[in-house]
Amino acid sequence: GSSFEHPATRSAAKHWASQTERKYINVQHEDSNGDVTAELYSQIVNPDTRLVTILHASPVTGISVDLEAIAAAIRSIAPEAFIIVDGVQYAAHGGIKIDQYNIDGYAISPYKMYSRHGYGFAWVSDRLTQMKHEQLLDGPDDNWELGTRDTGSYATISDVVKYLEWLGSKIENTD
């Protein structure tokens, strides 16, 4: 984790580090600009690092990080580490290029994209999908849902997607 991250992410990371008897490692942001960089992660991550969380954009400053470079730096030192990204703030403001990041998870919360509270979306790698996790008893191993979906929430995101498609059509460069 890093000092750049949302307190909820840091709290969960610290909790699970304690539960698994591992040291929580904190990447300190640059005081001059509030950013975290691949170089800063390279100074802290070690070959025994098992999980790294990265905030794609700050909810306080709006600063986004070079996710691809940070993930590459982590993989060069701890190739087996799971890399989980909080994309909640970034999703509505930047193009998400999952295939370029070499990460294991990316989560968003649609309420930050003109939708409602109470649900979210995540992309997980095949490697993370197969990891042992809390799940319904006797359910499929790759199921990460613990209950019934709120279908109203999914209906609202359909309108958001239509709006974003319309907005994107008005911009020349949609890379």
Question: PLM features: residue spans?
Answer:
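Pyridoxal 5′-phosphate
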Residues: 1-175
